[in-house]
């Protein structure tokens, strides 16, 4: 069984309490999404990390107890629900001492559509981050070409400024962007297929 391929295979393998590899894979896949999700709801970095840890621990316990039914909803929605209750518990425990940035957490936490959007945005960010890391580590793409793409697409640096800083032509900037985008698109598609039944 290839636990790196799909959420389905990973979930099946999680029933084996002795399979630490699959748990590590699951953790690597979902912890960053959960941390980003909590941060986007106004939690501090430390509280976001704590919420992610509590959510993952609760997930594993409930999953192994047979409480997750794929017919009733997607894994992402279930993780959002667990995280939501962990955040509400944090608010209750803090009894007014905890101040969230931005909108009221209660309003945000009651808006399922907003929560789903925050989750999906974080999921997309995680996929792109993983794809960029893979492109940098495993491809023969020139690091300068990748830097062009990052400057343009991640940091929104104007093409002329990228060309000036890297001492290349604007035409070369656009060529580099196109090459990296094409390679990155293929990696993203493969990674998305690993999350195939979790959207």
What would you call each of these model-derived segments?
Residues 65, 80-101:
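Arg/Lys-rich amphipathic alpha helix in sigma70-family domain 2
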Residues 2-11, 27-28, 35, 45-65, ...:
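Conserved RNAP core-binding helix
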Residues 16-36:
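A short, charge-rich alpha-helical start-of-domain segment used by transcription regulators
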Residues 15-16, 40-43, 54-72, 93-95:
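Sigma70-family region 2
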Residues 2-10, 97-120:
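Internal acidic/polar
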Residues 158-190:
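DNA-recognition helix of helix-turn-helix
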Residues 26-27, 134-161:
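Short amphipathic alpha helix immediately N-terminal
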Residues 63-81, 170, 175:
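Short, aromatic/basic-enriched loop-to-helix "N-cap" motif that marks the start
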